[in-house]
Amino acid sequence: MQRLKKFIAKREKGDKGKMKWNSSMDYDSPPSYQDVRRGIFPTAPLFGMEDDMMEFTPSLGIQTLKLQYKCVVNINAINPFRDFREAISAMQFWEADYSGYIGKKPFYRAIILHTARQLKTSNPGILDRGVVEYHATTQGRALVFHSLGPSPSMMFVPETFTREWNILTNKGTINVKIWLGETDTLSELEPILNPVNFRDDREMIEGAAIMGLEIKKQKDNTWLISKSH
């Protein structure tokens, strides 16, 4: 009987040892910080990571938009505009306290710049009342080259902007109504930014800068919107 008790006790002790060994095999120890760093690369950079371990979003490069547009501009001024520069300086106020579609804003600027060259006085005699009226309407389809990133979806719906403007010796009001949408036409289109519509390249570049656009000439002589401030 004494031998039997010793045998059972010895066997139980051996079973516990086996269970302990099996337990260490069934459950791996948690990975160390170094293991995680080596096996998983987060999209956000970690302090101390090498540049070649970081993830970057690829640039979309130069994009081409086919746009359908219509722009109607009406401006009142207490004095006639002396030159194109003064006219465009007044027109830039159309976007004061801008509350329209953010993604469309750079392209609105390009279209309004294009329309500015078409300004005409409504009635020269109206100056007798201390106000000069200018108006211009443009519409059609055109190309826009840009490197501003992803283009927004654009539906051909109108937006209206009415603002007061004041530049040194002149002031008045401006009203802009503009439609802008994409088109899938297969017809050949002219670029909206074209020096042919201006006195020269310099006038177009300066006008774009006043409107908040930085434009650059490409190798094929087309003009690219590189920045919108």
From Swiss-Prot:
GO terms for biological process: viral budding via host ESCRT complex. GO terms for cellular component: host cell cytoplasm; host cell nuclear membrane; membrane; viral envelope. It holds the Pfam family Vesiculo_matrix. A motif (dynamin binding) lies at residues 2-4. It is found in: Virion; Host endomembrane system; Host nucleus membrane; Host nucleus. A motif (PTAP/PSAP motif) lies at residues 42-45. It comes from the Viruses. A motif (PPXY motif) lies at residues 30-33. InterPro entries: Vesiculo_matrix, VSV_matrix_sf. The keyword Phosphoprotein applies. Phosphorylated by host. GO terms for molecular function: structural constituent of virion. Keywords: Apoptosis, Host cytoplasm, Host membrane, Host nucleus, Host-virus interaction, Membrane, Phosphoprotein, Viral budding, Viral budding via the host ESCRT complexes, Viral matrix protein, Viral release from host cell, Virion. The keyword Membrane applies. It is a peripheral membrane protein. Belongs to the vesiculoviruses matrix protein family. Homomultimer. Interacts with viral nucleocapsid; this interaction contributes to the virion assembly. Interacts with the viral envelope glycoprotein; this interaction contributes to the virion assembly. Interacts with host RAE1-NUP98 complex. Interacts with host NEDD4 and TSG101. Interacts with host dynamin. Interacts with host NDUFAF4; the interaction inhibits viral propagation and is independent of interferon activation. Interacts with host GTF2H5; the interaction may inhibit host transcription. Interacts with host DRG1. Interaction with host CTDNEP1. Interaction with host ABCE1. Late-budding domains (L domains) are short sequence motifs essential for viral particle budding. They recruit proteins of the host ESCRT machinery (Endosomal Sorting Complex Required for Transport) or ESCRT-associated proteins. M contains two overlapping L domains: a PPXY motif which interacts with the WW domain 3 of NEDD4 and a PTAP/PSAP motif, which interacts with the UEV domain of TSG101. Forms a double layer around the helical nucleocapsid, the inner matrix layer binding to the N helix and the outer matrix layer binding to the envelope glycoprotein. Plays a major role in assembly and budding of virion, by recruiting cellular partners of the ESCRT complexes that play a key role in releasing the budding particle from the host membrane. Condensates the ribonucleocapsid core during virus assembly. This is Matrix protein. It comes from Chandipura virus (strain I653514). The gene is M.
